[in-house]
Structure formats: structure tokens, C-alpha cells
Amino acid sequence: MTIQIFGTVCIDKVRKIEEFPKSLGTYTPVISEQILLGGEASNTFVCINEWVEKGQESIKLIVPPLVDDLNGKFIINKLNQSTGKTSDKNVIFTQIQEINNNNENNYLKYTPITDIYVCNKKERTMFGIGFPEIDQYMVQCKEIKEKILNVDLQFGPNHWISLDANYPLINREVIKKSIITNTNLYIMDQELDTVVDELSLENTSIEHTSNLIFQSSSDHFGNKDGPIKEFFNIMNQWFQKDNGIFKKFLFILTDSKNGFGIGGTWNNEWIEPYWFTPSAIPSDKVVDTTGAGDSFRAGLIFSLVHKNQSLSDSLEFASACGALNCLSIGGCSSTPTLNSINQFLKLNNKNQMFL
């Protein structure tokens, strides 16, 4: 079995500030800045890579096209450092594009960058550049699209593919081929209605697809810090869409430190939506919440899929991963170790795992 993480790999410029401006046109000083490896796919892969046995090649990061500029080289070096292994086995680079400023039709002009501002309330706001261009490039360049779908990614019931929402156009193609080939999917935040409609037009159903996991948050669905009852309403409305086709998914709807709702189908069994309240890091210990959801995804993939543990234990493990990732700046600059996760689980009277 191969677990493939495909999605956002970028540079994160993380800037700490006291508070966000209260009005336009005002000045806010930056306390500090760090330039880090970032992106949902990077954050998830670096976490899992910390835990797998050395020499393990079943966990792969599929990197979207990069530009061979200083930022692209920075990402490549950081990924090579993080794996500690030969990159061609665990990290697959779709394309390293030479800089070409003369071609106006060339979408791939620069490596994507995110400016992240973290305030004293530990909340962050992000500004990105280069992401839609790469998405367009991956679907409009026939050679690259074919390489992603027929060479870089492996499909079939013995494989998993995990996606995030920043490249929706190429994601649709990956999701459709995954459904057709009965490939397991773990999807974060991606809009799915369009894909389901397109599959329906092609007389293809997701009914018999292997395992489907959909993770999203109150940032996308609303009701942030709101009543739990409303989260269940949101989840049930989602399950009822398109004649109930989304009931095939295991749906995880998170609300930051407050917990998450979970329900749907796992291993062909229906789970009635319920609320999961995780053990939390004290608020005064939180440094930055960037990548918490990615680390949660990493924990669930590692425990539930890679190690075949129970759903309840895997949720505890994933929650601990997400919480501990908030103790440092950036999404994957200092990922939690198995030892630190087990200490956290023990401290909160939970089952320790993978000792």
C-alpha cells in the first residue's frame, strides 16, 4: 500500500505581530520574521516522515511543479533535509521549470509563497501568491497533467491519495480518476459538488469506492466557536446533498481547539455524527496554529491508515499531533515526535501508541 500526499508545497514567510490593524491605512510593526517550508502537503508529509521507520518508501509526497528560482531551490533543499533519505524515493517532483519571463502564456513564473501574520491571540491570517497559476498550469499543460495522472500518482484499491484545496482544478481530475479506479481518498476542504456532478454526467458513482475521508473546518463551513448542535445540523445537511451521496464519506468537521464533529461511513459501516472533545494545549503555551489541521491529518493517516489502529484511538493520536504542532512557529518547522505525542496522551490519561 502506498500513501501519497499531493498538494500545496510552498514557502511560508511567518511574521509575528501584536495585533491586526483595526482600520485600513494604519501601521503595524512586525516583531519577527521566519522563512520556512510550508504548504498543507509539506506539513502533513514532514509530520508522517518523522514517525515512519527509516527506509520506509510507502509514504510519498508528490510535489506540484516548482520554478527553478531561489525560492524553488529553498523548497527542494528543505525537503531533502526533512526526509533524511534520497528524495527520489519519498519525494517526487512533478517538474522543476526553468525561469522563463519571455513567454506570456507561461503560468509557471514563480514558486508559490504565503505571507502568514500571527498575532498575540495566536490566530493567523494568510496572503498567497502563485497558487492559481500553478493549478491552471497543471491542467492546461497536457504533458504535466498526463505525468501527474499516469506516472507520479498510483491509483487502485491498495493506494491512498490525500489532497488539499489549493489546486481545485487538478484535484478534480485526480478525484475522478480515483473514483473510477476505486482508490482511497483523504480530501481536505476541496469543493466536491462539481466533481460529483461531473461523475454523474459520466454515469460514474462513488457508491463502491473504497474509503473516502473528508476533513474541513468552521473556517469553511461557518459557525466558528458556535454551538455544537449547529455543527450537527451542518453535517447532516451535507450528508443529505445530492440524494445522500456524501454519506459515503467519513466527515470530520473541526472547530479549532473546541473539538470536532465526526460521522459518516468508515469500513462500510455508518457512524452517527458525534462530537469529539480533544485534550488541548493550555492557551498560554500556544505559539502558532498554522498547520494544526495538517498535523491532525498526518496523525490520522499514520494511525488509522498506515498502522491500521481503531478509529477512536486514531482520533486521539491525531488530536495530540494537531495540538502539539501549535507549540512552534510554522506548519512543519518542529513537528511532534512519537515520544512527545505519547507523553501528551499519558498526561491526559489516553492510550499510548507506537511505543
From Swiss-Prot:
One annotated GO molecular function is:
ketohexokinase activity
Keyword Kinase among UniProt keywords? yes
Keywords from the named record? ATP-binding, Carbohydrate metabolism, Kinase, Nucleotide-binding, Transferase
One of the protein's GO biological processes: response to sucrose
Look up keyword ATP-binding and say if it applies.
yes
Q: What is its EC number?
A: 2.7.1.-
Q: Which GO terms describe its cellular component?
A: cytoplasm
Q: What class of enzyme is it?
A: transferase
The record's comment on protein family reads: Belongs to the carbohydrate kinase PfkB family.
Question: This protein is called what?
Answer: Uncharacterized sugar kinase
Q: Which organism is it from?
A: Dictyostelium discoideum (Social amoeba)
